[in-house]
A protein has these predicted regions:
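Conserved, single-site charged/polar hotspot
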Residues: 2-665
Length: 665
């Protein structure tokens, strides 16, 4: 009651004040309130910075302590790894994280080659990788049933799923998956387990995917057979030997090295098979050397003993084969659309040879060299693998519905040629491989820096290019100039010079004999006014060399070499490139770089200028352009088309006229 009376008196006194004083009093009270709030805010700020008052001066002098933010990513898929970073795929997204400096050389983060394409727990400290725990304990088996409680595997029973398990579909486009995506009755997945539960599902392959069989050549591609094979694997692996019903198996732990020679006790039957215990396991051929070093192979390896040596055959899914073909055939730094065009070409080419095996004796469709497609010479790359996955199953078909012959080569000189250069009956039917000008507007007249190139009064157009450049004078005008509008005008191989100061007669003689043994119909001798196929006689002098016929686009098609003992006609671009290469002279490219050519000239798009001393030829100068045979897709042409905005389908439609791109599944 007294409090209320006191309050009422204060209010009465307040209202007795003049209006101006009341307003002034309100202002003072507001200022005091704001000052009090600022004081409280200041105290709170000091407290948050760790200041506890003047009684503890040592704390006020200490720098604020950083509390690290630690994040643990469970069961993520590592797609790529480098010395300073890793790229992971988790919850449908790819993300790259850099490594903490302290992890370098420590055991907390494995080496990059150990982390690539592995399941792992990744620890991040302030968004930097501080630890990686790989989960490499995997198995595979036929799936009989699956639900949220676990997965039933043939021979293993039901295995529980971890609460935080993750599933990844590795084929086609990399995506997430669950137990519901498993195919019952098939063993097309690996399972990663930890502490008795499944923590990862790796859908490695699509069921019933067709396989390709690749003959692996010896080191440096010196031979198709091996005298000894040394191998190991990055997972446990089976060695199967015997034949028929007497197949026996031995299980080896990952990292164990096995040596097989011609006298090995394992050769009870004809073949020995080495099969990784998991689908994502890889076999290393320690006795084989490639540009990448020691190659490792997906799929499984078979060893076949023959009288001459051991044939090594790698069987694996076609799509996985392409993972190692595309980076070996085209630099992984090229634009994605060019890589996709290369992937479609490579897939079509490989499938064509799966229909007609190149090595029926060894049970192989192709080998791993330039004789077919270079395979596993360069390590797989994320960009090229992406190109393969984004074009999954796509191939090129002719207008008749057959698989196209998708030949390709490195670089054009500004024009391509046709398959007629190979002098086979089949080549005559490949009418979709045309001789075309490689520039943005091929339908327009060919332009040089000084105007249109012409023979007489006829301009060279896309329609007349094959015929016009077959004429010596026209081709000479073309190849001795550069054409700024050409797609590859800035490429090193677009123009080159090869100057032989002293002719190597013995080398020419030896090469002529070798090429005659390979195909006598293409190395002819002049006798009684006609050329015919007969053995090459020795000669000691060369008196002249002349190109007597050019093919579509101006490619050298027939070459005549006159000697002191006879005159010879060399037919086909390959034979001509071989005969004129002395193995010593270096090619000088248009950018000034020099390149050794041990066995072949870069291309047969060239003109030759002999130098004579009285009656004999002492040397020759070659002005040429391009690298490769010139048939089908130019890879550097595709690169520059992609840089100018063309897509993979547009690129392929340019090089394979009238063909269609569709799924081969």
């Amino acid at each position: 009651m007294k409090k209320n009376l006191k309050k009422n008196r204060l209010l009465e006194n307040y209202y007795k004040l003049p209006k101006g004083q009341r307003i002034q009093l309100k202002k003072y009270l507001c200022i005091l309130a704001v000052a009090f709030l600022l004081f409280l805010l200041f105290l709170n700020l000091l407290h948050s910075c760790g200041w506890e008052g003047t009684d503890t001066p040592e704390m006020s002098e200490t720098s604020p302590q950083h509390i690290p933010v630690v994040q643990k990513l469970k069961n993520v898929w590592i797609t790529d790894a480098e010395a300073d970073r890793i790229t992971i795929f988790c919850d449908g997204e790819k993300e790259t994280f850099f490594l903490e400096a302290e992890t370098e050389g420590s055991d907390s983060v494995p080496a990059p080659e150990q982390m690539r394409e592995q399941l792992a727990d990744v620890e991040l400290t302030d968004e930097l990788v501080s630890a990686v725990v790989l989960k490499t304990d995997k198995f595979t088996g036929r799936v009989l049933s699956a639900n949220e409680n676990g997965i039933e595997i043939e021979g293993r029973g039901r295995i529980p799923l971890a609460e935080d398990y993750k599933g990844y579909r590795l084929y086609r486009e990399l995506t997430m998956c669950t137990f519901a995506d498993l195919t019952f009755g098939y063993a097309n997945a690996d399972f990663v387990w930890e502490d008795g539960v499944i923590c990862g599902i790796l859908l490695a392959r699509e069921a019933n995917m067709e396989d390709i069989r690749v003959l692996i050549k010896a080191s440096d591609y010196a031979d198709i057979l091996h005298t000894e094979v040394i191998l190991t694997a990055d997972s446990d692996f089976l060695l199967q030997y015997g034949s028929g019903e007497n197949i026996q198996e031995e299980l080896f732990p990952k990292g164990d090295k096995i040596t097989i020679d011609m006298d090995s006790d394992y050769f009870v039957g004809e073949r020995i098979s080495i099969v990784p215990a998991v689908l994502t396991g890889r076999i290393q051929l320690l006795s084989v050397n490639r540009s990448q070093g020691t190659p490792s192979y997906r799929g499984h390896i078979e060893l076949l003993r023959t009288a001459e040596g051991i044939a090594v055959v790698n069987e694996l899914p076609l799509e996985e084969y392409l993972f190692s073909v595309v980076p070996s055939e085209m630099p992984s730094s090229y634009p994605l659309e060019a890589l996709k065009a290369q992937a479609i070409c490579a897939r079509t080419y490989a499938y064509g040879h799966m229909l007609r095996a190149g090595y029926p004796r060894y049970g192989a469709h192709v080998d791993d060299s330039t004789s077919y497609q270079v395979y596993n010479n360069i390590t797989e790359a994320d960009s090229t693998t992406t190109a393969v996955k984004e074009t999954y199953g796509q191939m090129i078909f002719t207008d008749e519905g057959t698989v196209a012959d998708t030949y390709y080569y490195s670089t054009s000189c500004g024009v391509g040629t046709t398959a007629s250069i190979w002098k086979t009956a089949e080549a005559q039917m490949l009418d979709y491989l045309k001789s075309s000008r490689l520039r943005p507007s091929p339908e327009n007249p060919v332009q040089t820096d000084d105007g249109a190139v012409a023979t007489g009064s006829t301009e060279i157009t896309a329609e007349t290019i094959a015929e016009e450049l077959s004429e010596e004078e026209s081709f000479r005008d073309f190849i001795t100039q550069t054409h700024a509008e050409d797609y590859e005008a800035q490429e090193g191989w677009y123009r080159w010079i090869y100057t032989v100061k002293e002719i190597d007669v013995d080398r020419i003689l030896e090469t002529l004999k070798n090429r005659y043994e390979a195909n006598g119909k293409l190395i002819l001798t002049l006798k009684d006014g006609d050329y015919s196929s007969q053995s090459i006689k020795n000669f000691s002098k060369v008196t002249d060399i002349t190109i007597v016929k050019r093919g579509p686009g101006g490619v050298a098609d027939e070459l005549v070499i006159a000697t002191d003992k006879g005159t010879y006609k060399i037919i086909s671009e390959y034979n001509i490139r071989a005969v004129l290469c002395d193995g010593v002279t270096r090619v000088v490219r248009q950018d000034g770089s020099e390149v050794s050519m041990p066995s072949l000239l870069p291309s047969a798009f060239f003109v030759i200028e002999p130098s004579h001393d009285k009656k004999n030829m002492i040397g020759y100068n070659i002005i040429g352009g391009g690298f490769g045979h010139g048939v089908g897709m130019s890879q550097n042409g595709a690169k520059n088309m992609a840089l100018q905005g063309l897509g993979a389908e547009q690129i392929l439609n340019f090089f394979y006229e009238g063909c269609e791109i569709c799924s081969g599944q």
